[in-house]
Amino acid sequence: MSMARRDFIKQTAAAAAATVAGVPLTGYTQNIVTESEAAKLKWSKAPCRFCGTGCGVNVAVKDNQVVATHGDFNAEVNKGLNCVKGYFLSKIMYGSDRLTQPLLRIKDGKYAKDGEFAPVSWDQAFDVMAEQFKRVLKDKGPEAVGMFGSGQWTVWEGYAALKLMKAGFRTNNLDPNARHCMASAAVGFMRTFGADEPMGCYDDIENADAFVLWGSNMAEMHPILWTRVTDRRLSAPATKVAVLSTFEHRSYELADLTLTFEPQSDLAILNYIANHIIRTKRVNRDFVDKHTVFREGNADIGYGLRPEHPLQQAARNAGDAGGSKPITFDDFARFVSKYDLEYTAKLSGVPKNRLEELAELYADPKVRVTSFWTMGFNQHTRGVWCNNMVYNIHLLTGKISTPGNSPFSLTGQPSACGTAREVGTFSHRLPADLVVTNPEHRRHAEEIWKLPDGTIPSKVGAHAVLQNRMLKDGKINAYWVMVNNNMQAAANLMNEGLPGYRNPENFIVVSDAYPTVTTLSADLILPAAMWVEKEGAYGNAERRTQFWHQLVDAPGQARSDLWQLVEFSKRFKVEEVWPADLLAKKPEYRGKTLYDVLFANGKVNQFPNTELDPEYANQEAQAFGFYLQKGLFEEYAEFGRGHGHDLAPFDVYHKARGLRWPVVDGKETLWRYREGSDPYVKPGTGFQFYGNPDGKAVIFALPYEPPPEAPDKEYPFWLSTGRVLEHWHSGSMTRRVPELYKAFPEAVCFMHPDDAQALGVRRGVEVEVVSRRGKMRTRVETRGRDKPPRGLVFVPWFDAGQLINKVTLDATDPISFQTDFKKCAVKIVKV
């Protein structure tokens, strides 16, 4: 089969997307504007607002409103293409129920937890908010304050939040919603390579001979990257595509090899491949001997449940989940030898010939393999292990850090990499892979921030799941949520999420652009600017940092998260939040506000507004009197320059279509850790995994372990949750786009037809999905894109009217603390 690239682009990017979504694209797909009236539009560049692919778009503005967008032909990521969500970017900011003023729960003229929402001014909102935060800080200390942020924060918004929480309020109770999606990937990188984020880039796609998808439906979740994979598959017929999943989905349509496996058995399959490589003598011994070491990880590590849970009580190594010990290659070979073809086929349910064919793709030294994975790996009670184990395979064969040979973790949010991971908005991190538990790292941050020694606390803060538990238990009492919808996204939300938000002891603030399940659970709602209503920067999955200008004003009184964070800092005198002994080390800070110390510190405020581009507005710069974004970025960039995370100067990014770090002497890095590509690799070494002190990557011996909950007689089905092409995350933006809403208006329960028949239900019939934790009502779907095997159901989570996370289990990976949304036990009950 052959297809011209032009035809491929037309059919894949437009027709296929439209067919899947059921959306007429007439008027939205035309990239060349010829109408005279339309030609008066002002066009500017920006990265897409949705997933972590980082597509470039051109944005048209007229009369202070975004009126059109199209794929940016000059963007290397997408080369002019858009997915169906990208086609409708111009509509995401203009839902009729946009939040435009602060709303506070009021009763009898004053704030009350049981009050009704009423409009207030920003001053009133911040007065009440500051009063509540100061009360908690005084009564309980900084550990009773928390913030839940986002992989959708811009780089400088995340950096400002990091400074406010970890240096200002002196608490590490800051975590992003990327904990739900990328924590296992980040910890996997750190354990194997000593440094976070992929070594490869999207150029691997055009150089690979085989693609293996592990728990990733790229056709719907990363459709533009999927068009590039499809292009490679069709233009190079020898290229193979293998897809592994617990149920059949759209990505199966391109696959040469499909493997539908029993949930959790991917662990065994990964070990089988390693065993096959060793047994057939295809180990790249020269690479392995020079560039790797072997360790055996602790097993029986529990499931991240509450400490009193029986499974946690029974786990032998729950207190040292990330521990490991050194072993030899021979020890590793013996360890994986158990995972032979017979055992793995029986455990996984995958036919032997398919397992062998998959293993051969990795084992064949002539085949360049790129592995892609997303939530199927990461949202897993052994997600860190999955990440480590796929690296094992690439390291054993030396298929890493060269064009086409790449283990590639894909991200789901536009700046889960650039903000959550690189900036370090996790409860244990600081910028550029630094961590709060390392005293040298803390001192380095304090020096850059011009703070006294001991400002940053050494104790790891509460991660996302623990934050909900602490809110419920009354241990966190002042809490700020920004750019996420956790009361729709959190597992076991009715038992472990909502009770904490409505706990009478707690004051909950939610900043968002639209009403959501989470805003309705709050005490104070702050209206947020979104996307091109502010100047921003995102970092995508291939380490590409991209900037955009503010193109339009936010409606009403909506303000950016950056403005909210920085303005709120003015409400606190240093004496109100720091102990006397700390302040004594910097007596010149006495009487100053956190704003003075953190943001008007002589570094962040060093760039005057005369450096602004006169073509564009910048509300934050006008509000504070200096180029705030540039000051924050340049201070943040100090952490990474010279340390393998080099960023280019601020002004460069507004001209470029993004650059992949490390950027050294103006040159971006495509493949890390390889001599000749990565400037940090010493000449003569070939490869150098310099994140680890010895320059070597770690190959981990890790076992198969069962999930915490599996189907039984009472709850006979596996439940998996996830996304669909038309909607993004909780749907708070995409469900307000009429075309996307109509294409997929509500969630359904995808089920095998034979299971439906056995239950006496038909397509479209209402059922309840019931677990040990809760239940929700939806309709049965036995046809369409997702085709579960018997015994498994799939329910998307985008629908605020059908909260599937009432049902899910709040078990996490005990190392990364990322939730497993992909497997728990349920029963289906006809209504």
UniProtKB/Swiss-Prot annotation:
GO molecular function terms attached to this record: 4 iron, 4 sulfur cluster binding; electron transfer activity; iron ion binding; molybdenum ion binding; molybdopterin cofactor binding; nitrate reductase (cytochrome) activity
Gene3D superfamilies xref list: 2.40.40.20, 3.30.200.210, 3.40.50.740, Dimethylsulfoxide Reductase, domain 2 (3.40.228.10)
Positions contributing to Mo-bis(molybdopterin guanine dinucleotide) binding: 85, 152, 177, 181, 214-221, 245-249, 264-266, 375, 379, 485, 511-512, 534, 561, 721-730, 805, 822
InterPro entries assigned: Asp_de-COase-like_dom_sf (IPR009010), CT_Nitrate-R-NapA-like (IPR041957), MoPterin_dinucl-bd_dom (IPR006657), Mopterin_OxRdtase (IPR006656), Mopterin_OxRdtase_4Fe-4S_dom (IPR006963), MopterinOxRdtase_cofactor_BS (IPR027467), Periplasm_NO3_reductase_lsu (IPR010051), Prok_molybdopt-oxidoreductase (IPR050123)
GO cellular component: membrane; nitrate reductase complex; periplasmic space
Signal peptide: 1-38
PROSITE patterns: 4FE4S_MOW_BIS_MGD, MOLYBDOPTERIN_PROK_1, TAT
Coiled coil ranges: none
Documented EC number(s): 1.9.6.1
Cofactor(s) named in the record: [4Fe-4S] cluster; Mo-bis(molybdopterin guanine dinucleotide)
Compartments (UniProt record): Periplasm
Catalysed reactions, as listed in the record: 2 Fe(II)-[cytochrome] + nitrate + 2 H(+) = 2 Fe(III)-[cytochrome] + nitrite + H2O
Keyword tags: 4Fe-4S, Electron transport, Iron, Iron-sulfur, Metal-binding, Molybdenum, Nitrate assimilation, Oxidoreductase, Periplasm, Signal, Transport
Classification via Pfam families: Molybdop_Fe4S4, Molybdopterin, Molydop_binding
Chain residues that bind substrate: 797
Positions that bind [4Fe-4S] cluster: 48, 51, 55, 83
Cofactor comment text: Binds 1 [4Fe-4S] cluster. Binds 1 molybdenum-bis(molybdopterin guanine dinucleotide) (Mo-bis-MGD) cofactor per subunit.
Top-rank EC class of the record's enzyme: oxidoreductase
Annotated 4Fe-4S Mo/W bis-MGD-type domain residues: 41-97
Entry-linked SUPFAM superfamilies: ADC-like, Formate dehydrogenase/DMSO reductase, domains 1-3
Post-translational modification: Predicted to be exported by the Tat system. The position of the signal peptide cleavage has not been experimentally proven.
Function: Catalytic subunit of the periplasmic nitrate reductase complex NapAB. Receives electrons from NapB and catalyzes the reduction of nitrate to nitrite.
Quaternary structure and interacting proteins, as annotated: Component of the periplasmic nitrate reductase NapAB complex composed of NapA and NapB.
Family: Belongs to the prokaryotic molybdopterin-containing oxidoreductase family. NasA/NapA/NarB subfamily.
Protein name: Periplasmic nitrate reductase
Organism: Bordetella parapertussis (strain 12822 / ATCC BAA-587 / NCTC 13253)
Taxonomic lineage: Bacteria, Pseudomonadati, Pseudomonadota, Betaproteobacteria, Burkholderiales
Gene that this polypeptide is encoded by: napA
